[in-house]
Curated annotation (Swiss-Prot):
Pathway where this protein functions: Amino-acid biosynthesis; L-leucine biosynthesis; L-leucine from 3-methyl-2-oxobutanoate: step 2/4
CDD domains named in the record: IPMI
Keywords: 4Fe-4S, Amino-acid biosynthesis, Branched-chain amino acid biosynthesis, Iron, Iron-sulfur, Leucine biosynthesis, Lyase, Metal-binding
Pfam family for this entry, one: Aconitase
Residue positions binding [4Fe-4S] cluster: 347, 407, 410
GO biological process, one term: L-leucine biosynthetic process
Enzyme class: lyase
EC number(s) on file: 4.2.1.33
The name this protein goes by in its record: 3-isopropylmalate dehydratase large subunit
Family according to the record: Belongs to the aconitase/IPM isomerase family. LeuC type 1 subfamily.
SUPFAM superfamilies per UniProt: Aconitase iron-sulfur domain
Amino acid sequence: MKKTLYQKLYDSHIVYEEKSQSPILYIDLHLVHEVTSPQAFFSLCSKNRVVRQPKKTFATMDHNVSTIDRNIDSSGLLAKKQMEALIKNCTKFNIKLFDLNHPHQGIVHVIGPEQGITLPGMTIVCGDSHTSTHGAFGALAFGIGTSEVEHVLATQTLKQNRLKSMHIKINGDIDIGITAKDIILFVIKQLGVSRGLGYVIEFSGEIVSKLSMESRMTLCNMSIEMGAKSGIIAPDSVTFSYLCNRKYVPKGKNWNLAIDYWKTLKSDTGAIFDQEFNIDISNLSPQVTWGTNPSQVISINDTIPHLESYSDPIERRSAELSLLYMGLEPGMSLIDVNIQKVFIGSCTNSRIEDLRAVAKIVMNKRVCNSVHAIIVPGSGMVKMQAEKEGLDKIFKNSGFEWRYSGCSMCLAMNDDRLNNKERCASTSNRNFEGRQGRGGRTHLVSPVMAAAAAIFGRFVDVRTIYNSLDK
């Protein structure tokens, strides 16, 4: 039987299956952070159970850490208690922890790949919905709830229903200044936020094959915003080059054996997908969200759609409420909208490739006086590399705050957040009401679009900046 990549990964990890029951899958890698793990560890200890395979469990502090300093007290008492609990639990069960003072601390979905902990062919889980990021390596990676975190800690397995397979081919030619963030926002606009329910999405096509691993991670990171369980991309030479010589990858002969196996991780020719979509992005422009879900997005030179354009009454009502919350009106151009804050960071867009692109845009320019702009590297390694290249000096000279690593303003769980009705150009992945702070208004954009917005104090087509750089 010809199989999709998802089916291959799923079937190869079944350890027990009984008729009319969800199969039990073996989990190769369990990633843990401070927010969704305390209850799981507490329940585990109350039942006198242990972590079954601590060497396949890695932990970090990211969600509620302060990125202003490395003080465990900076984000409040609850955050401090959660971080202290993680230290205690990792010490007790001998789990590798990248804590606040570890040079490799960072966002869980950044440090896994950059350390070579994430590998093709794995099943990977974490108590975080954007675990789908790791699917860029040809891994079956998905978020789980706290009770499931406990189950994986105790058994290294998890009950999982079989899902359907969706195939999205992305083809065409892209203009300078168009990024993976623009691509995935456009895909979400075309397919909607619920099209992926019950599916794992495999991305392919000539565009995907040309993307770096950082960009592929952005695609898979936001597959969850279509309602999918995960996104996945078959590993190839780009994947292998990225992983080569990273700390936790196989070494010596084992590396060659791993490559041989990883090359088999692709959908069979003729494998049947439950849904397939071909998306041409040849004329794609930079994307900016205007509403309160990622599908409410337009090209920078377009205007916000009129409510009459929605045939579905539910979508029309959703758009109406989104505009009310965002303080916008149908027919408006986002180029006319001023912003107060810029956030460049998150597990979607905080890697070294993102920061290099931002530096090119802001070099020898100044952040608008009315804008508070922060750049938050995704990990200690990203921060060190950026500083080695002098990017931090470019950012600071331009008026950006250069921070320590963490999730920061992606979510209102730490000391970085929006105030009521503050408008933010953000490189994160969700623009829900209150996501970045109560009453805060989030516009999702690429790193270079966010950088340009910081300079001008409003949204602009970043391609005009690229064109001026070429002259």
